[in-house]
UniProtKB/Swiss-Prot annotation:
Domain of life: Bacteria
Enzyme class: transferase
The name this protein goes by in its record: 2-C-methyl-D-erythritol 4-phosphate cytidylyltransferase
CDD domains linked to this entry: CDP-ME_synthetase
Pathway(s) the chain acts in: Isoprenoid biosynthesis; isopentenyl diphosphate biosynthesis via DXP pathway; isopentenyl diphosphate from 1-deoxy-D-xylulose 5-phosphate: step 2/6
Gene Ontology biological-process annotations: isopentenyl diphosphate biosynthetic process, methylerythritol 4-phosphate pathway
Record-annotated site: Transition state stabilizer: 15, 22
Gene3D superfamilies: Spore Coat Polysaccharide Biosynthesis Protein SpsA, Chain A (3.90.550.10)
EC number(s) reported in the record: 2.7.7.60
UniProt keyword NADP, yes or no: no
Alphabetic keyword roster: Isoprene biosynthesis, Nucleotidyltransferase, Transferase
Gene Ontology molecular functions: 2-C-methyl-D-erythritol 4-phosphate cytidylyltransferase activity
Family, as annotated: Belongs to the IspD/TarI cytidylyltransferase family. IspD subfamily.
Encoding gene, per UniProt annotation: ispD
Length: 219
């Protein structure tokens, strides 16, 4: 069975306050995006890796790869207008049948255990996402103010979100709506249940300068 990692990296670094897109920022001298690809290559050296990047960033990425001697085999697809369209472009390069894991390019600290768990369960469950517990108190905003809700009723969603390849391709044939906030929401729109597995708290999404400091501490 074919395994594919589809890495989506379309950020512009606005929240980071940097001219350099966040996926290219270095952690201990190595770009975030390279560390992310390495995590999946470490899990399965034969895995197909597809990187989705805005066309205007692709030459710079190739220059970075040459500069760092980065030789992990991967294909590049053009980023789209939205994340939905970016993933759809990447899916066009998926080889054959199997399972596809879609992962944020700025989550380099996903554990090998989480990757294995998601891909293993997706073979049986067809649609799997990693989640972690909410540890802070949560309040729901109302017209009159706000109210406390039970944090036990909520989970924080991470990536990779892993699906049967055929199912995922059919899901992405749907018309785009703003309610598609992640891949699970696209698949759920077809009436397909999504199975939850345990993620890892270190699997942070690097989007702010503070996140970069945390990332450096995690090495």
């Amino acid at each position: 069975m074919c395994r594919t990692a589809l890495i989506v990296a379309g950020g512009k670094g606005l929240r980071m306050g940097s001219e350099l897109p966040k996926q290219f920022l270095p952690i201990d001298g190595k770009p975030v995006l390279m560390r992310t690809l390495e995590a999946f290559h470490r899990f399965d050296e034969k895995m197909q890796i597809i990187l989705v990047l805005p066309r205007e960033q692709q030459d710079f990425w190739r220059e970075l790869c040459e500069e760092h001697g980065f030789d992990i085999k991967h294909q590049i697809a053009d980023g789209g207008e939205t994340r939905f369209h970016s993933v759809k472009n990447g899916l066009a390069l998926v080889n054959g049948i199997g399972v596809v894991g879609i992962h944020d390019g700025v989550r380099p600290f996903v554990s090998q255990e989480v990757i294995a768990r998601c891909f293993r369960e997706a073979v049986v469950r067809k649609a799997v996402i990693p989640v972690i517990d909410v540890v802070e108190t949560v309040r729901h905003l109302t017209e009159s103010g706000s109210e406390t809700v039970s944090r036990n009723d909520y989970k924080l969603v991470q990536t990779p979100q892993v699906f049967d390849a055929d199912l995922l391709k059919r899901a992405y044939e749907q018309e785009f709506t703003p309610f598609f906030t992640d891949d699970a929401s696209v698949v759920e729109a077809m009436g397909v249940p999504v199975y939850l597995v345990e993620g890892n708290r270190e699997n942070i999404k690097i989007t702010t300068p503070f996140d970069l400091k945390v990332a450096s501490a995690l090495l």
